[in-house]
């Protein structure tokens, strides 16, 4: 009898510790599974997102660049503030500029970009749905040099990028 009560107590402690350890493992695995589901959703959205540059233009001053992109993917693009526009261009004195251009929803200022005209914008106004085109209006300072070859890289919030070359003003 004197060994029975301590043995029962030890057995109960072992059972409780086994239950708590198993519970901790299950909770950890559940967290990992939820993160994997979230990651799979994000990767799926990234795989279904695609942009195609259909045109570029620059005004005579070299300050205003227009890039037209077509949503050739299967998901919409709507979070413009989370998009990246990076320019690599030469100015009038042949100095190379590598510039990240932030989005603005207000008036276009120097070294900012905004959305312009949407083409085939049937559903969801001002959201770039599949099959629709949008103008990206960019203003830079210093201005793009005449007769230079320059590059623009556009990245969506889902991590998909497209790049294009554009010429400076004639």
Regions found by a protein language model. Give the residues of each.
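Membrane engagement elements in two modes
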Residues: 1-54
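Terminal connector regions
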Residues: 30-31, 139-170
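Short, solvent-exposed loop/turn segments enriched in Ser/Thr/Gly
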Residues: 60-66, 146-150
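Surface-exposed loops/turns
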Residues: 61, 129-130
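Asparagine-centered strand-capping/turn motif at beta-strand->loop junctions
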Residues: 68-74
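A short beta-turn/strand-edge loop motif at beta-sheet boundaries
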Residues: 74-79, 144-146
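The feature marks short-to-medium sequence segments in extracytoplasmic or secretory-pathway proteins
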Residues: 76-128
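Short strand-edge motifs at loop-to-beta-strand transitions and within beta-strands
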Residues: 124, 132-138
